[in-house]
Amino acid sequence: CAGGKLDPTAIRVADLAKTTQDPLLAKIRASLRKNHSFCRDLKRPLGISAIYSIEPRQGKATGGLACSGYGSAVTVTAAFGFAATSTCLNQITNR
């Protein structure tokens, strides 16, 4: 989730099991392990690429916005989109 993030250089691509600083990805990871028979070993990769930011959230939630009320800087949301597109294209072309 890009909410509450300001630094586009903190975006990373990694296996879903290795992501940090993202409560939404943590919920997805827990759901996959609990409801869909994914490996419960926290040290093993899940085999799913995820785009996330290592930057802690900035500011306080104000409510009513996406990502639990945190706003987003356009530079961060754009960088998330570019990272996601690059990851998809690399996987499609097997790089």
PLM-predicted stretches and their roles:
Residues 2-8:
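Short gly/pro/ser/thr-enriched loop/turn and capping motifs at secondary-structure boundaries
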Residues 1-2, 54:
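Short secondary-structure boundary segments
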Residues 10, 17-95:
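Glycine-rich phosphate/adenylate-binding loop
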